[in-house]
């Protein structure tokens, strides 16, 4: 059931950050758009890291000037990523084992092609399992 490629369910319109942006800029963007994390890309669109609200919180605890620091100084560069051809089942395992909420999807050149979320996998599973639309009232007892 989870043998389809992640490219079939991933989100392709992704808000990103650049390493030279300030943490303050990105914090405002994340608050405005209610985001918990952003992929960080270079100007060719290659994934170079990930910045999360936790990364920013951790940094502001030790750096009083955290808002003016650059994303590249705060971001996590050890990022688990998937390829567009990877299976939805692989993504599901990562979400369960690592408790990720979002995983970047990159091509062979490292360019960001999209992200897949745990919600994408849940929605995919429900649509495969139940051919008819699921209504909230049908789930609640």
Q: Model segments located where?
A:
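Tandem CBS (Bateman) regulatory domains
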Residues: 1-13, 52-83, 87-97, 117-141
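Short charge-dense sequence patches
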Residues: 3-8, 20-24, 39-47, 114
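Short, flexible active-site loop motifs that bind/organize anionic cofactors or intermediates
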Residues: 13-16, 46, 81, 111
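The conserved cystathionine-beta-synthase
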Residues: 16-34, 41, 82-99, 106, ...
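A glycine-centered beta-loop-beta connector
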Residues: 30-33, 38-54, 95, 103-119
């Amino acid at each position: 059931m989870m043998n389809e490629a992640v490219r079939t369910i991933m989100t392709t319109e992704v808000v990103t950050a650049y390493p030279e942006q300030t943490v303050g800029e990105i914090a405002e963007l994340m608050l405005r758009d209610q985001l918990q994390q952003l992929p960080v890309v270079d100007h060719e669109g290659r994934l170079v890291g990930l910045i999360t609200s936790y990364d920013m919180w951790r940094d502001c605890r030790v750096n009083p000037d955290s808002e003016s620091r650059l994303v590249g100084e705060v971001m996590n560069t050890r990022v688990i990523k998937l390829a567009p051809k990877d299976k939805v089942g692989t993504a599901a395992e990562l979400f369960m084992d690592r408790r990720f909420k979002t995983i970047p999807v990159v091509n062979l050149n490292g360019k960001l092609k999209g992200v897949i979320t745990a919600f994408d996998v849940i929605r995919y599973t429900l649509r495969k399992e139940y051919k008819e639309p699921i209504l909230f009232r049908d789930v609640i007892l």
